[in-house]
Amino acid sequence: MIKPNRLANKNFLSSLDITTDEVFHILDLSKKFKNKKLNINLHNKVLGLIFDKSSTRTRVSFQVAMSRLGGTTIDLNPTTSQIERGEPIKDTARVLSRYCDVIAIRTFNHADLEEYARWSTKPVINALTDLEHPCQALADFLTIYEEFLDFKDVVLTFIGDGNNVANSLILCGALLGVEVRIACPKGYEPNSMVINKAYEIYKNRNLLKITNDPDTAVLGANVLYTDVWSSMGEENQKAEKDKVFNGFTIDNDLVSKADKEAIILHCLPAYRSKEITDEVFESKKNRIFDQAENRMHVQQALLSCLLY
């Protein structure tokens, strides 16, 4: 049995909090968990969840992952705790880190996540912020690795809003040396600091391309990835974004320009006829539900690394 203790007691706030070797270590552990070749016991360990945003896959995958590891999950609903009444983050963090062994947080402001980590004495995990979604990126690259058995020569194209998911794909892609292309409307590009940091990591700067032309971005791509155009908290921008993102739908025409063996990814929920057509979503190229399942296996690996 492998003892996955390389990340013990570290925070995981960003894809940049782990090294290339550590990414591969997590992916390797994830595959072992998926194939039932690894047994880790986190009995008496407690995971605390603080979710300011709604969630299906992230919440459930963390809960199931911790349960399968023998641990317990406490769901701390902000609306039924003192968080809702404005208790300072530093006070909440110092108390919860005496009750819990690890805390996963989904919040709007990345700075709030960093504040929790600053005051917590236990590991803090980014379960999504406005800046990054690093757990999602790990599951994404696990899915890609399962499909192609290697990252060499893989081209990943993300079509849509340069949001938290795109930011984490860029950073994790840089760590793995994967060519990442982002196609988004002008003004909706990924975070500039994320782009600059990725360029520092890439040995070949040409492996990261940001464009406003989806047709160019998908040429020869092995993976086509998209996400909702309007993230949580942007409901008032939906009508405007639907107009701006017209032409950035993954449809059969766009897919035909990619590699003939290309696969389709989406972090869900998906809005058919918006970012992706129903025909493409339901095609044989769909690896979206493998991708969703892999969230659970990655979470098992990550929790094991932090706690075992």
From Swiss-Prot:
<dbReference type="GO" id="GO:0004585">
    <property type="term" value="F:ornithine carbamoyltransferase activity"/>
</dbReference>
<comment type="function">
    <text>Reversibly catalyzes the transfer of the carbamoyl group from carbamoyl phosphate (CP) to the N(epsilon) atom of ornithine (ORN) to produce L-citrulline.</text>
</comment>
<dbReference type="GO" id="GO:0006526">
    <property type="term" value="P:L-arginine biosynthetic process"/>
</dbReference>
<dbReference type="InterPro" id="IPR036901">
    <property type="entry name" value="Asp/Orn_carbamoylTrfase_sf"/>
</dbReference>
<keyword id="KW-0808">Transferase</keyword>
<dbReference type="InterPro" id="IPR006132">
    <property type="entry name" value="Asp/Orn_carbamoyltranf_P-bd"/>
</dbReference>
<feature type="binding site">
    <location>
        <position position="295"/>
    </location>
    <ligand>
        <name>carbamoyl phosphate</name>
    </ligand>
</feature>
<feature type="binding site">
    <location>
        <position position="82"/>
    </location>
    <ligand>
        <name>carbamoyl phosphate</name>
    </ligand>
</feature>
<dbReference type="Pfam" id="PF00185">
    <property type="entry name" value="OTCace"/>
</dbReference>
<comment type="similarity">
    <text>Belongs to the aspartate/ornithine carbamoyltransferase superfamily. OTCase family.</text>
</comment>
<keyword id="KW-0963">Cytoplasm</keyword>
<feature type="binding site">
    <location>
        <begin position="55"/>
        <end position="58"/>
    </location>
    <ligand>
        <name>carbamoyl phosphate</name>
    </ligand>
</feature>
<feature type="binding site">
    <location>
        <begin position="133"/>
        <end position="136"/>
    </location>
    <ligand>
        <name>carbamoyl phosphate</name>
    </ligand>
</feature>
<dbReference type="InterPro" id="IPR006130">
    <property type="entry name" value="Asp/Orn_carbamoylTrfase"/>
</dbReference>
<keyword id="KW-0028">Amino-acid biosynthesis</keyword>
<protein>
    <recommendedName>
        <fullName>Ornithine carbamoyltransferase</fullName>
        <ecNumber>2.1.3.3</ecNumber>
    </recommendedName>
</protein>
<dbReference type="InterPro" id="IPR006131">
    <property type="entry name" value="Asp_carbamoyltransf_Asp/Orn-bd"/>
</dbReference>
<keyword id="KW-0055">Arginine biosynthesis</keyword>
<dbReference type="InterPro" id="IPR002292">
    <property type="entry name" value="Orn/put_carbamltrans"/>
</dbReference>
<feature type="binding site">
    <location>
        <begin position="267"/>
        <end position="268"/>
    </location>
    <ligand>
        <name>carbamoyl phosphate</name>
    </ligand>
</feature>
<dbReference type="InterPro" id="IPR024904">
    <property type="entry name" value="OTCase_ArgI"/>
</dbReference>
<dbReference type="GO" id="GO:0042450">
    <property type="term" value="P:arginine biosynthetic process via ornithine"/>
</dbReference>
<feature type="binding site">
    <location>
        <position position="227"/>
    </location>
    <ligand>
        <name>L-ornithine</name>
    </ligand>
</feature>
<dbReference type="GO" id="GO:0005737">
    <property type="term" value="C:cytoplasm"/>
</dbReference>
<comment type="pathway">
    <text>Amino-acid biosynthesis; L-arginine biosynthesis; L-arginine from L-ornithine and carbamoyl phosphate: step 1/3.</text>
</comment>
<dbReference type="GO" id="GO:0016597">
    <property type="term" value="F:amino acid binding"/>
</dbReference>
<feature type="binding site">
    <location>
        <begin position="231"/>
        <end position="232"/>
    </location>
    <ligand>
        <name>L-ornithine</name>
    </ligand>
</feature>
<dbReference type="Pfam" id="PF02729">
    <property type="entry name" value="OTCace_N"/>
</dbReference>
<dbReference type="GO" id="GO:0019240">
    <property type="term" value="P:citrulline biosynthetic process"/>
</dbReference>
<feature type="binding site">
    <location>
        <position position="106"/>
    </location>
    <ligand>
        <name>carbamoyl phosphate</name>
    </ligand>
</feature>
<feature type="binding site">
    <location>
        <position position="164"/>
    </location>
    <ligand>
        <name>L-ornithine</name>
    </ligand>
</feature>
